[in-house]
Amino acid sequence: MLVKKAEDRGQLEFVNLENMVPQDHLLRKIDAAIDFKKIYEFVEDLYCEDNGRPSVDPVVLFKIVLIQHIYGLPSLRRTLEEVSMNLAYRWFIGYPLNEAVPHFSTVSYNFKHRFNHTTVEHVFRWVLKSAAEEGYLDTEAIFVDGTHIKASANLKKQAGKAVPKQAKRYAKELFEEVNKDREEHGKKPFSEDSGKKPPEERETVVSTTDPESGIFHKGEHKKCFAYEAHTACDKHNFILGVHVTPGNVPDSTAFDPLYDELCQNYPEHKTVVADSAYKTPWICKRIFESGRVLSTCYTRPKTKEKGHPWWAYVYDEYFDDVICPEYHALHYSTTNRDGYREYKSRAYLCKTCPTRGMCTESAKCEKTFLRHIWQEYVEMAEDIRHMAVYRELYRLRKEKIERVFADAKEKHGMRYTQYRGLAQVTNWVKLKFAAMNLKKNGHLEMELPPSCTGWRQTNKIREKYSCYFDIFPFFGLACTHKTCSGLIATAGFSTS
């Protein structure tokens, strides 16, 4: 039967906002999982105690921005429009129906001029600390990767610029080891002349709209100005750290500041899982020397097309020579400034070699083989990737760090940014990742009853008996709660 409802939009009603928000709403879960009054401790030094106009509650300002990032709203203007009309949003920030929400410019001004990078970092760490206290973090293995964020800059508005080449962070250590290696081989060490020569420059393309962004062009991606978010997460997809750089900075270059942050906050981690972009001599050396393991993937050798395969050249550690496919020795020649030992063949042997065309096209009939002084650490990573434990860890990358990037872009609006400048984009990314961690924390807090200790104690037991979990990965906790059993099974543990 057709029913035509009469519209009565002017009717007066008494409404209890508490009853209008469902008990299983996401914002209720987040509000129950964490105490937002902690934010007052982070911002109290930024306000005057006895002077000035009354401010908007800083907790309200942070809750508004968290709403924007949790629901992937594109701008603060749109966010405040939604907050004004959405009952759940009003309940979350504590504003009744008849109270006007803050103007979007007030929120924008505070996050641009009052709440600095330190404040945002405190909030990011506070959310992670809350998750750690509940036992949700599993930092035994850390997954590292980078993803690009399209900048608010037109590719056509660009200009060429000569910028000085930045020295590598490990340049001093490499220089010392190169000289030590040269002295061991009877060569004269290099002189330190970096202070005498002006720094080398390189030509690059800079956006006239956002000069701090960088050109990004990789694979099938369209060329654009972008930023790069170098990120680390744990086994439960909690984001542990992020370092934002221009889009033209390689992953291996940005690894050091991110790894410093991880070592400072999570020194207990044992394994770093990363793709081939991080499989460099310096990164391998740093991770293995710190007593940890780098779990990475196979790297296709960059050899000559239709030439000898890479494994046909064998390094003889005893004689410090390289044996070529025709069983001739390439003897040590020198160690260059980049840290590579050069092994060269004898020209008279190469002239009569039947496979010279597959080996070298040098006019001098001389084959040069390069081997880094830290190559042994790369070989350690290559050996470790064949172990079953680390092979399985690497297979989890697509479910961990790649899933974090997919959720951030598809559900939380991180595909492109409307902010300009490295500092603003960094704060924007950290707040977005804090919101994602908060969302996960809220879901876990509400889905697991306080009496169910399976999930919360899993990490504590794994930390104490980690060696047994490495040998028997099927060993887990006996928890009969339905939700907990599902979550523990998702994490890779058995409940029987």
Model feature map: region roles:
Residues 18-21, 53, 221:
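Short secondary-structure boundary/capping segments within folded domains
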Residues 89-93:
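Short amphipathic alpha-helical interface patches used for protein-protein assembly/oligomerization
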Residues 3, 72-85, 95-496:
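Anion-binding and metal-coordination hotspots
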Residues 23-66, 71-72:
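Basic, short loop/linker segments at the boundary and entry of helix-turn-helix/winged-helix-like folds
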Residues 1-28:
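Hydrophobic alpha-helical membrane-insertion signals
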